[in-house]
Design a protein with these regions (language model features):
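Membrane-interface motif at the C-terminal end of an N-terminal transmembrane signal
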Residues: 18-36
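Histidine-/acidic-rich catalytic cores in large beta-rich domains
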Residues: 32-47, 51-55, 61-93, 114-116, ...
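Membrane-proximal envelope biogenesis segments
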Residues: 14-18, 24-25, 47, 129
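Solvent-exposed serine/threonine-rich low-complexity stretches and specific carbohydrate-binding patches
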Residues: 99-110
Length: 484
C-alpha cells in the first residue's frame, strides 16, 4: 500500500558537533555537566537564587531576572514579579536576523498576581530584546522590554537550520525536540522552533534522553545510561534517580500508579536490551518486572552468540504501557511486535506480529497473528505506538510505527531476509523505509495494513509521531513527524 506523502513533515537533521569537555563557555556558568545533575548543586543553586532575590518588591516595572540559575538550559532565564491584579503572561524574544519567538509563561492558574517562570528562546552571542506582556481579565494589557546579551552555547550546534524542501503550511507554535546526539563529546537535548531556530540547549551527562514525560507539572527524562532526572517548570532538578546495574535503553513510560517502566539492559547478564524494570518515583526502588529470556528461553538458545560479546538476541526498542498492565514491545532483532500480558504480576505472551517464515520451527508459532492483505510485514521497526479509536470495536486498535523496512538479524544467520520481497538488506544500498499503520484485531487474531507512505531509507533507529489525535491519519487532518 503506497500513498503520496501529503501532509507529512520529514526532518533530516545532520548536525556536526565539535564540542569540548562539557564546560559552559558563558563565564556566568562554568560548571561541569556531571555536577549539574547532583542534588547538592541544585540545592545550592536554589539557595543562591533565593538569597539574590531576597524580599524585593518586584513588579512588571521592576522584574527580577537571572540567567539559567540551575544550569539546565543555556537559552533560558528565570523570571519573577507580581502584578497589582491577576494577569496571564506572555513573552517575546527578539534578536536581529532571527524570527521572533513568543510563548505563554507557565502558571498554575490562567490569571494570577504572582508570576514565576522559566523564559526560553534566547539567542546566543546576541543582544536579545525580551518583551513581557501582562494581560488582565478585562482584556487590557501592559508590556515592558529589556535587553540581555547572552554568551555562547555550550555546544557548536547550528542555531538556524536550513530548509531544503517543504510546503508553506502553517506549522503552529511548537518546539521540535532532538533527544540527544549520543556522541563521544558532550551530549544535549535540542529544541528548535517552527522557523528552525534553536530555542533550548539542554546539556545531559551522556547517551540520550529517550523520552520527555510530564507528570504533575514535572518533566521526567533520562540524562545518562543510568540516571533519570525530574525537572520542574523553573528548570530546577527536583530529583535524580539512579538505576543501579540497569542501563536504560530506548524507551520508558508511566504505569497506572505513576511509576516509571523502562526497557533496560541488566549489566550482570551476558545479554542486552531484553529486560523491563520499574522505578518507584517515591521510594527510588528499582525492580525487575521481566527478563524476556523467561518467556523466550528456547528461542534465545537457538540464536547465534559469539563468546565474550554481548548477546543482542531480541533488542527491544519501543515500550507501550496499557492500562490493563499489558505492554506492547517492538523487537528490532526479530522484526516483530510482541504483546505481553500482566507485566507487573505474572507476565505471559499474548501475541506476536512478525514474519511467519522467521518464527517457523520455533516454539512460538502459536502466538503469531494472521496477516490480512497483501503487504510486507515491517522490518526492524521503531517507535511502535498504540492508538485507540472510538469508531473501532472492543479489542481493536491501531499500531503505527516507523517501518525501517530493513531485514537483518545478527543472531539469526540461518535466516535469509531476502525471501521477503521488497525488504531492504543493505545499509548502504537501501532506498525506502515507510510509515506504517496496522489495524490490530485481538478478537480475530489478525493485523491489517491500513495506512502507509514511503519515507527516505533509514536502516536503524528513526521515529514516526502523529500530531492530532487518534483519528488524524485516517481523516488526514494531522501532521506526521518523521525523524531520520
Amino acid at each position: 500500500m503506497k500513498k503520496k506523502l501529503g501532509n507529512i513533515l520529514i526532518f533530516v537533521l545532520i548536525i556536526g558537533l565539535t564540542i569540548g569537555y562539557g564546560i559552559y563557555k558563558d563565564s556566568q556558568s562554568k560548571v561541569t555537566v556531571n555536577k549539574i545533575y547532583t542534588m547538592e548543586y541544585q540545592e545550592q543553586a536554589l539557595s543562591d537564587l533565593e538569597n539574590e532575590k531576597g524580599n524585593g518588591n518586584y513588579t512588571l516595572q521592576n522584574i527580577f531576572m537571572k540567567y539559567n540559575p540551575f544550569s539546565t538550559n543555556t537559552q533560558s532565564m528565570y523570571v519573577y514579579f507580581n502584578t497589582y491584579k491577576a494577569a496571564k503572561i506572555t513573552y517575546t524574544v527578539s534578536c536581529a536576523d532571527y524570527a521572533d519567538f513568543t510563548a505563554t509563561a507557565y502558571q498554575a492558574k490562567e490569571f494570577q498576581k504572582e508570576h514565576e517562570f522559566q523564559l526560553i528562546g534566547l539567542i546566543p552571542d546576541c543582544t536579545n530584546t525580551i518583551t513581557i506582556t501582562a494581560t488582565y481579565k478585562d482584556g487590557t494589557s501592559q508590556s515592558i522590554s529589556t535587553n540581555y546579551t547572552m554568551g555562547s552555547l555550550l555546544g557548536d550546534e547550528d542555531i538556524q537550520l536550513k530548509q531544503v524542501s517543504g510546503s508553506k503550511q502553517d506549522l503552529g507554535n511548537g518546539l521540535y525536540t532532538l533527544l540527544g546526539n549520543d556522541a563521544d563529546d558532550q551530549d544535549f537535548v535540542y529544541m528548535y522552533d517552527t522557523n528552525g531556530i534553536l530555542r533550548s540547549e539542554i546539556p545531559i551527562i551522556g547517551y540520550r534522553s529517550h523520552r520527555m514525560l510530564k507528570q504533575n507539572q514535572t518533566l521526567y527524562m533520562s540524562v545518562s545510561t543510568h540516571r533519570m532526572a525530574a525537572i520542574n517548570h523553573l528548570g530546577r532538578i527536583e530529583h535524580i534517580y539512579n538505576l543501579g546495574n540497569y542501563i536504560v535503553h530506548h524507551d520508558y513510560q508511566f504505569n497506572q500508579d505513576g511509576n516509571l517502566i523502562f526497557l533496560a539492559t541488566n549489566e550482570e547478564k551476558n545479554s542486552v536490551e531484553d529486560c523491563i524494570i520499574k522505578l518507584d518515583v517515591e521510594t527510588e526502588e528499582v525492580s525487575e518486572l521481566l527478563d524476556l529470556e523467561d518467556l523466550f528461553k528456547s528461542y534465545k538458545e537457538s540464536t547465534d552468540h559469539k563468546e565474550g560479546s554481548k548477546w543482542d538476541w531480541m533488542h527491544i526498542n519501543t515500550l507501550q504501557y496499557l492500562k490493563d498492565d499489558s505492554v506492547i514491545l517492538s523487537s528490532r532483532e526479530t522484526s516483530s511486535i510482541i504483546k505481553i500480558n500482566d507485566v507487573s504480576t505474572n507476565p505471559s505472551i499474548d501475541y506476536i506480529i512478525g514474519n511467519e517464515d522467521f518464527w517457523k520451527d520455533t516454539d512460538y508459532t502459536e502466538y503469531l497473528y494472521t496477516k490480512v492483505g497483501d503487504f510486507l510485514t515491517s522490518g526492524g521497526q521503531h517507535t511502535v505506538t498504540y492508538m485507540e479509536d472510538n469508531s473501532l470495536e472492543s479489542g481493536q486498535y491501531y499500531l503505527y510505527m516507523f517501518d525501517n523496512n530493513f531485514g537483518y538479524s545478527k543472531t539469526r544467520k540461518d535466516y535469509d531476509w531476502t525471501v521477503n520481497e521488497g525488504i531492504q538488506t543493505s545499509i548502504t544500498e537501501g532506498t525506502t523505509s515507510y510509515y506504517y499503520q496496522y489495524l490490530v484485531d485481538e478478537n480475530e487474531g489478525t493485523y491489517t495494513l491500513v495506512d502507509s507512505f514511503e519515507v527516505p531509507f533509514s536502516a536503524y533507529v528513526s521515529s514516526a509521531q502523529n500530531l492530532g489525535g487518534a483519528h488524524c491519519r485516517r481523516f488526514r487532518n494531522c501532521r506526521t513527524i518523521i525523524h531520520l
